[in-house]
């Protein structure tokens, strides 16, 4: 069975590729994200205060960390939040607005996409959460933007 991807170093393939230009942009939470973040943090803080760090399992602290990371990426990553926030959405426009206001990062991505589309550039978007890519996929479909998505999933 032949591999789908061949790994090659830049030096082996192409001389004209410009050097990587990486920029870190700090993105604030939306008001909605801030509310959920404080809720998750406060809930876990009470557990820590009650039982102390010695009796808390590392897995519980890791779970809190993952929940906070999900909250910072997009609220729809949190269990039950998507259903809660979209319950009253009657139109695609309502859903689109809720999708954006649930993530400061997606709001910034929306601005970047508009800018890069005007300049006829392409983008690569990476995420550690497959579900985040699903959310971005929904956003792109709603905007009518063509895309390709690569994940570790295998289809029959």
Q: Language model features by range: what are they?
A:
Residues 12-33, 54-156:
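Conserved Helicase C-terminal RecA-like lobe
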Residues 1-18, 35, 39-40:
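Non-catalytic, charged helical/coil tracts that couple and regulate nucleotide-powered enzyme cores
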Residues 46-55:
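Short, polar/flexible loop-turn hinges at active-site or ligand-entry regions and domain interfaces
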Residues 4, 8, 47, 72-78:
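Short secondary-structure junctions and interdomain/linker hinges
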């Amino acid at each position: 069975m032949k591999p789908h991807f061949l790994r090659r170093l830049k030096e082996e393939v192409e001389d004209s590729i410009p050097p990587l230009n990486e920029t870190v942009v700090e993105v604030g939470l939306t008001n909605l994200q801030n509310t959920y973040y404080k809720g998750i943090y406060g809930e876990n803080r009470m557990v820590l205060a009650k039982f102390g760090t010695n009796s808390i399992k590392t897995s519980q602290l890791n779970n809190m960390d993952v929940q906070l990371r999900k909250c910072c990426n997009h609220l729809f990553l949190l269990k039950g939040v998507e259903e809660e926030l979209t319950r009253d959405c009657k139109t695609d426009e309502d859903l689109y607005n809720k999708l954006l206001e649930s993530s400061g990062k997606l709001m910034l991505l929306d601005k970047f996409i508009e800018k890069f589309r005007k300049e006829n550039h392409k983008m690569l978007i990476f995420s550690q959460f497959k579900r985040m890519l699903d959310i971005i996929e929904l956003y792109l479909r709603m905007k009518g933007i063509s895309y390709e998505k690569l994940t570790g999933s295998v289809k029959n």
